[in-house]
Amino acid sequence: MADLKAILDSIYTDILPRVGEGKVADYIPELAKVDPRQFGMAIVTVDGKVYRVGDADIAFSIQSISKVFMLTLALGKVGEGLWKRVGREPSGSAFNSIVQLEHESGIPRNPFINAGAIAVTDVVMAGHAPREAIGELLRFVRYLADDESITIDDKVARSETQTGYRNVALANFMRAYRNLDHPVDHVLGVYFHQCALSMSCEQLARAGLFLAARGSNPMTGHSVVSPKRARRINALMLTCGHYDGSGDFAYHVGLPGKSGVGGGIFAVAPGIASIAVWSPGLNKVGNSQLGAVALEMLAARTGWSVFGD
């Protein structure tokens, strides 16, 4: 394997002069307070080695990256039946598009846009009170990362609850089309809390390692999903994981990944490693500007792109 420490150090050196680029997600008041002049990156390999640079131990709001973990839970509960509620195609529209949802009769295009993630959350809630569903997700992520210190930032959750008007509209559209089984306020309460998960790059890379290792976490010995399901979650991340910037990310980076407006990106090099990068400044489609640049550098310097070196 390439000398990952040297490669990661070289990426950090090249990124450092640009730290602060992009614009923080100011439409969520708590995220607007985050200092954009931060950058961290962590790599966890399938043989258990951990590499990190910069602010890799600072917890940040993972936001939409949480959708990967919620999707994993939902597939565990209902399997392929999930795809009656949500599609598997790239959206080509903004992550919070209302027009597309109405045009497609309340069936969200994929589980990683906001409407799709809200539908997935509704599935996970079956038989649970909202507080129980939030607890289930938190326990699951702690189990994946083998880290009981992971928390949900209640200030961020409240901030989203107070300003998430488009998400309220999306949920009401789906409820009108009978694609939500639970009351809108209950589903959104869970959704806003899942997006407020607070994790560091290292914690996030550890939690997602099962997707790099055929569904099992080699560091903990935990079997999480089947190899087939891991492969399919990775496929969805590659095609849909970066909103309407997914094609561009595949073109430049060539790895399955999921971004969040907190500035994080989680990525997978199948059979090799899981990667998490964080830089709060976003590009025009809501993905971490320097996070994407750093991952492009990583793919180029390691040859890890799924499309070849």
Swiss-Prot record:
Q: Name one GO molecular function term.
A: glutaminase activity
Could you list this entry's UniProt keywords, alphabetically sorted. Answer: Hydrolase
Name the InterPro entries on file: Beta-lactam/transpept-like, Glutaminase
Please tell me whether the keyword Hydrolase is annotated for this protein: yes
Q: Name one Pfam family in it.
A: Glutaminase
Q: Which residues bind substrate?
A: 64, 114, 160, 167, 191, 243, 261
Q: What are the BP-aspect GO terms? A: glutamate biosynthetic process; glutamine catabolic process
Please state what class of enzyme this protein is: hydrolase
Specify the signal sequence span. none
EC number(s)? 3.5.1.2
**Which reaction is the catalytic activity of this chain?**
L-glutamine + H2O = L-glutamate + NH4(+)
Listed PANTHER family? GLUTAMINASE (PTHR12544:SF29)
Please state which protein family the record places this protein in: Belongs to the glutaminase family.
Oligomer and partners: Homotetramer.
Q: Which HAMAP family does this chain map to?
A: Glutaminase
Write the protein's name. Glutaminase
State the encoding gene. glsA
